[in-house]
């Protein structure tokens, strides 16, 4: 850290004289960022690093005028970035959509950095919340509504439709149900759902690229209602797809359901990864390691951490009243990933396709309840696309 003139430390609760400044902030032109010691700087890092992300995002926006575009769409907004596959972003993104003030909002909705202070307060803990009967009813409601919204998105998927159009429909469907779309502004995510096409593993940002015949696309939906989040996703075929896509999507769904079949009190969370990886590898696929399932209720992401790969070190044993997601991401090639310069879009490093399915689950006395299950059918949407 660089030495600076005498100032007061910016760590919450510290009024010591500050002699150091964050070197990254200096490079990015961020004013302030003074600390009294390395210890204070490290203690503030979880919050402070979000300033770096915001500054980089704003810099990228300022560079829009220098883009080379086809018509009004730019498919190469990050000069010099080497894409791992054929997919390209279609920028600029449409403006962030507003949520009416009468809809209850999570704590991060209006935070300038999209930070959830309630999640940060529990970061690092492995204690898993046991939900009360009131909590469980709240989760049942929001998960049912989230399922309704995903089913609406499913009906839109066909060649020529953009993921931006899907996001718009999702946003309106959330509002119509008096729900907040949980992804919106979560650590500054700019849209109301995630749409992940082909080599995108997860957290794809909806844009103006039309879906193409032969694509696969995952739509990830989370709603917030009465203080609770409900989370699910499915992968869909776009028109006719090749046999490799069919096998990948079918196997990914089987990985999820085999893991769900094992959920009951007394099972260690780390066992789920063994089940998922065994089935994926038996079919010639790999399991993403960077992204995991998670606890969910009044917090969007919390304990337990639920890895999908084998021999993981996840902490915790299932008990009746736990609620969490399982959401395996399965790849045609290697499991290694990287992230686009937008800071969100996770893609396979080798450019091969990835698929995902997710449910939110309640552990019961004898097994589990799939809170995000379809009510009109026992099977996911892709099975009706065969």
UniProtKB/Swiss-Prot annotation:
Residues the record lists as binding Zn(2+) 3: 220, 231, 358
Predominant cellular place of this UniProt entry's protein: cytoplasm
Record: residues binding Zn(2+) 1: 9, 14, 36, 40
Zinc finger (C6H2-type): 6-59
InterPro entries, per database record: Creatinase/aminopeptidase-like, Pept_M24, Pept_M24_MAP, Pept_M24A_MAP1, Zfn-C6H2
Keyword Cytoplasm: yes
Binding sites annotated in the UniProt record for Zn(2+) 4: 231, 294, 327, 358
One GO BP: proteolysis
Protein name stated in the entry: Methionine aminopeptidase 1
Gene encoding the protein: METAP1
């Amino acid at each position: 850290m660089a030495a600076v003139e005498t100032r007061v430390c910016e760590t919450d609760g510290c009024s010591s004289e500050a002699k150091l400044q964050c070197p990254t902030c200096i490079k990015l032109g961020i004013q302030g960022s003074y600390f009294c010691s390395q210890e204070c700087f490290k203690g503030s890092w979880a919050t402070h690093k979000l300033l770096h992300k915001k500054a980089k995002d704003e810099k990228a926006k300022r560079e829009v005028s220098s883009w080379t575009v086809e018509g009004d769409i730019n498919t190469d907004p990050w000069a010099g970035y080497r894409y791992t596959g054929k997919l390209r972003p279609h920028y600029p993104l449409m403006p962030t959509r507003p949520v009416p003030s009468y809809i209850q909002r999570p704590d991060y909705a209006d935070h300038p950095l999209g930070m959830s202070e309630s999640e940060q307060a529990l970061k690092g803990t492995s204690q898993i919340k046991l939900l009360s009967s009131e909590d469980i009813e709240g989760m049942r409601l929001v998960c049912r509504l989230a399922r309704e919204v995903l089913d609406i998105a499913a009906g839109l998927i066909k060649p020529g439709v953009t993921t931006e159009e899907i996001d718009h429909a999702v946003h309106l469907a959330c509002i119509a149900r008096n729900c907040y779309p949980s992804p919106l502004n979560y650590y500054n995510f700019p849209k109301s759902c995630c749409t992940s096409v082909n080599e995108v593993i997860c957290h794809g940002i909806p844009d103006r690229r039309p879906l193409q015949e032969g694509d696969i696309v995952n739509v990830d939906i989370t709603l917030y209602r009465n203080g609770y989040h409900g989370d699910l996703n499915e992968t869909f075929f776009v028109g006719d797809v090749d046999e490799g896509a069919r096998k990948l999507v079918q196997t990914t769904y089987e990985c999820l359901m085999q893991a769900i079949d094992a959920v009951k009190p007394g099972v260690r969370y780390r066992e789920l990864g063994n089940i998922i990886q065994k089935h994926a590898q038996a079919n010639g696929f790999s399991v993403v390691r960077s992204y995991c399932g998670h606890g969910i209720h009044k917090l969007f992401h919390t304990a337990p951490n639920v890895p999908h790969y084998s021999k993981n070190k996840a902490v915790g044993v299932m008990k009746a009243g736990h609620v969490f997601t399982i959401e395996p991401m399965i790849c045609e090639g290697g499991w290694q990933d990287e992230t686009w310069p937008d800071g969100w879009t996770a893609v396979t490093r080798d450019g091969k396709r990835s698929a995902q399915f997710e449910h939110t689950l309640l552990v019961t006395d004898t097994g589990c309840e799939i809170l995000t299950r379809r009510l009109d059918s026992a099977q996911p949407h892709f099975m009706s696309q065969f």
